[in-house]
Amino acid sequence: MAAAKWLIASLAFASSGLAFTPEDFISAPRRGEAIPDPKGELAVFHVSKYNFDKKDRPSGWNLLNLKNGDISVLTTDSDVSEITWLGDGTKVVYVNGTDSVKGGVGIWISDAKNFGNAYKAGSVNGAFSGLKLAKSGDKINFVGYGQSTTKGDLYNEAAAKEAVSSARIYDSLFVRHWDTYVSTQFNAVFSGALTKNGDKYSFDGKLKNLVQPVKYAESPYPPFGGSGDYDLSSDGKTVAFMSKAPELPKANLTTSYIFLVPHDGSRVAEPINKRNGPRTPQGIEGASSSPVFSPDGKRIAYLQMATKNYESDRRVIHIAEVGSNKPVQRIASNWDRSPEAVKWSSDGRTLYVTAEDHATGKLFTLPADARDNHKPEVVKHDGSVSSFYFVGSSKSVLISGNSLWSNALYQVATPGRPNRKLFYANEHDPELKGLGPNDIEPLWVDGARTKIHSWIVKPTGFDKNKVYPLAFLIHGGPQGSWGDNWSTRWNPRVWADQGYVVVAPNPTGSTGFGQKLTDDITNDWGGAPYKDLVKIWEHVHNNIKYIDTDNGIAAGASFGGFMVNWIQGQDLGRKFKALVSHDGTFVGSSKIGTDELFFIEHDFNGTFFEARQNYDRWDCSKPELVAKWSTPQLVVHNDFDFRLSVAEGVGLFNVLQEKGVPSRFLNFPDETHWVTKPENSLVWHQQVLGWVNKWSGINKSNPKSIKLSDCPIEVVDHEAHSYFDY
């Protein structure tokens, strides 16, 4: 047990005297959502911690006492990939990745109070996850998901025959999506049942594919779909799942439906909100999400956007009666926020929803029959909500969340009452020592068209009488935001503790401030958002004395990377000592190489061949812009980034080098749009922070700051001079 002490939060901090370092950031325990038992006494959650010495990330499962916040170890077995409550006291079902079936998983049953006394209920012949269970007579019905073959069988990669050729052949889109070349396998929801024999349950290994009978359907939908894409009714008889519209081109449109199907697969799944269908509200043909049955199984709530090719349209709550032909009802449809998840109260009268509001993921409640103009009420909690579950049959919910100052916040929230704190990681984990809300504050500035929000993040030991270089961090999306939540990649506090004051703006295009601000970036990528950033920089320069803009730096990823490339060719580019562009577009016309065409076709008001002028308008590679380049720039781009090809980063670096602009190219051949592997993440931080620290002067003012020389990776440098030195 001593080897697993990290699984339980330490009660005292180690006295290192150092600020929050990349090593602290990467090695801090990472905790998953806490799921309460049926009685609301205990909650189970996953935890892992990277070990730089051993180069591994052991994981396990903990129990959270919902009365006093105490944490205890349930298991240190890293092969246990998920645990869910059986619905019978403290009994649990878990999936173990090691099984007698090669490439399969085992379904095990145990008791949280005696976890070691587990027994195996059966095996699944392939990768399988996302268990949801409901009692149905003398059985426990369940659903989960895995990959399906074209014939409808659960795909087992380990048992698959090796192809005679590596060729890929396509007659339709997608060719590749996010980080993967699309294959003939696809995600599908499968159903099965646990049968009780005496005091034990068994599984016969038989699964029913509920998705494959609908040609071209897929659920959960990649790349980010999961168990939130489907639900099982409380009686275990009906399954709902979300799929992209099977009859429409998936790369061009976002339209998706909520399908209903019997758990036993006795009928083919049918959509309840098909485009132009008899039950679907007029004009509603966008993306659907978050299907969830009411407690009695008679209704289903889900979220849907209106626009068919816009992934960042406003979601609206919809409710449909199951087994009825009545029109689907829209709930609080005029609320100018975009819900992300929805759940029913135990009596079916109230809906609990999460939505981003002013850069914070908040929890709201509203009546299940709320009229169009109803404004949901906020439930008090700290930080941003990642997930929530009801505590027993009460109105209280267990929130798993985080913030800019803590990577895990477990708390109980009840409408109309103060929240009750159970466990905040920053108060226990040595790696997060010193982090807290006092170093974070909002900033509002008049932007190009409206007031624009930013976060100011200060370093450990901040002194208002001292001066700190500006770190101007630009978020991606572009329809995204810097929220009051923890990032495991771009974390403002890591930057601040190098010796900067971070300003993280939410310019035009950002989410959570009303749909108009989000929509206003359409066909205006380098317009209003750039003007917002200029005005924020000017406000900081003129009004905040403790921020040194003369030695400031700017950095961004994805859209933020584009904006850094755009800034390099604008007047604002001359205001920074260094720039960092991570996975940002460079050549306007290269956007046609992306995966999700609906994204660019919405944001640039047309297809590549019909609206070419819109793609070219915000082209960072225009000669008149390149002529202005002079600020040292680090370019980061990875091989498995299929959102925008690595050639974008190489091309950008080519021009910087030929222009004689101090520059460096950082590439990870095994990473995607994001850098997620721990050792790669450390190198990323060493290079990115080392780069800006060199040019901003931080290396001189803060001896403990990261230097480029801290990185052990050898630099490829075959030339002594720039091309134009000759």
UniProtKB/Swiss-Prot annotation:
GO terms for cellular component: extracellular region. It holds the Pfam family PD40. Glycans are attached at residues 96, 252, 485, 605, 699. The keyword Glycoprotein applies. The keyword Glycoprotein applies. Residues 1-19 form the signal peptide. Residues 269-291 are annotated as: Disordered. Its main location: secreted. InterPro entries: 6-blade_b-propeller_TolB-like (IPR011042), AB_hydrolase_fold (IPR029058), PD40 (IPR011659), Peptidase_S9_cat (IPR001375). Gene3D superfamilies: alpha/beta hydrolase, TolB, C-terminal domain. The active site is at residues 558, 641, 673. GO terms for molecular function: aminopeptidase activity; serine-type endopeptidase activity. One of its GO terms (biological process) is proteolysis. Belongs to the peptidase S9C family. Extracellular dipeptidyl-peptidase which removes N-terminal dipeptides sequentially from polypeptides having unsubstituted N-termini. Contributes to pathogenicity. This is Probable dipeptidyl-peptidase 5. It comes from Arthroderma benhamiae (strain ATCC MYA-4681 / CBS 112371). The lineage of its organism: Eukaryota, Fungi, Dikarya, Ascomycota, Pezizomycotina.
